[in-house]
Every structure is written in structure tokens, then in C-alpha cells.
């Protein structure tokens, strides 16, 4: 008697585990030429880290103004900041260059929305391990699955913001007035 088996092995899609996010949110208390002292918002702990290397590698985005909220990627053992982004300057209403009447709003809670017609409908934004990430769906309704784009911050200050979205550079100016901060 001969017996055979045809067991099919189930192939599962294996995804690489996502790198844990080491970004911390802080309130800047003091700044010198090479270090920042801040209050870590979640732990209420005061820390000081060097940021000179981050500045040399263009990983400091925004003005370092006392009292502002920053997103910092720390290396605590080495007492260094790998990346610093001024979240207080990043949030708000941004209008794209070119007088097209289009732009976006980035809220402090991570919500993002478009202003005017756009090729994408923004859902949220986040800073993860020093990267600016926008989550969106195509505006034409062709696909309702959220997509994310790990963008590069080119420059940021209280009035101007340049970044990439899907490899294209976007330049914005901040709008301030009665309904904005």
C-alpha cells in the first residue's frame, strides 16, 4: 500500500518590522551655540543634548526659540540630538507659492487638510525618526486606501516651509490672521 500527501504550505507575507519611533516632543527651555535644554513633555524631565552635528547635517529645521515645541530624535547615551524640528513653526495654515489659492493646514494634533483643489486629500501628518510624513488619499476618488509619503523637509522657519511630496518640491508661506495662529 502506498500513501501520499499533498500538504500545501501556506505562504505568509512577511513584512519587515517597522523601526520604533524614537521621536520625543519637548518644550525648549534654553539654547546655546551647540546645545539645547528642554522639558520632555511626556516625562516632565529636563534634559540637555548637543545639536551641533545635527545642524551640520541639515537636520535642524526651524528656529530654536525658547518656549516652542520641538520634535527631537535623541541619542541619550551620547547626549546628542540627531534631528530637531520646530513643531510650533510647522503647525498652522500654509499656502503654496504661485498665488493658486491652494495650501494645507497642519494641526498640532497631527490632523492635516487641504485648502483648495489638490491632487491629494491630506489626512494626517507626523514626524517619525526625524522624517516628515504626510498621509493622504488621491483626490480623484480612484483609491480610498491611505498612502503615506516620507517627505524631506528642505527648509522651515516661522514664515516659510519647503518640503518634498512624492519627489516634488512644495514651497509654502504661512498665513496669519483672524482665523489662524
Describe every region a protein language model picked out.
Residues 2-3:
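C-terminal motif of bacterial Sec signal peptides marking the signal peptidase cleavage site
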Residues 6-25, 31-122, 133-181:
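Lipid interaction determinants
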Amino acid at each position: 500500500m502506498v500513501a501520499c500527501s499533498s500538504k500545501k504550505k501556506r505562504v505568509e507575507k512577511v513584512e519587515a518590522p517597522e523601526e520604533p519611533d524614537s521621536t520625543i516632543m519637548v518644550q525648549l527651555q534654553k539654547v546655546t551655540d551647540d546645545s539645547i535644554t528642554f522639558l520632555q513633555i511626556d516625562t516632565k524631565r529636563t534634559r540637555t543634548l548637543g545639536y551641533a552635528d545635527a545642524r551640520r547635517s541639515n537636520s535642524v529645521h526651524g528656529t530654536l526659540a525658547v518656549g516652542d515645541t520641538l520634535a527631537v530624535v535623541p541619542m541619550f547615551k551620547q547626549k546628542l540630538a540627531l534631528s530637531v524640528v520646530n513643531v510650533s513653526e510647522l503647525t498652522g495654515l500654509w499656502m503654496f507659492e504661485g498665488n493658486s489659492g491652494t495650501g494645507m493646514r497642519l494641526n498640532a494634533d497631527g490632523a492635516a487638510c487641504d485648502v483648495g483643489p489638490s491632487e491629494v486629500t491630506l489626512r494626517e501628518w507626523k514626524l517619525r525618526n526625524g522624517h516628515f510624513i504626510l498621509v493622504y488619499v488621491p483626490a480623484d476618488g480612484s483609491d480610498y486606501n491611505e498612502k503615506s509619503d516620507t517627505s524631506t523637509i528642505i527648509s522651515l522657519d516661522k514664515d516659510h516651509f519647503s518640503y518634498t511630496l512624492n519627489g516634488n518640491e512644495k514651497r509654502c508661506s504661512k498665513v496669519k490672521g483672524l482665523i489662524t495662529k
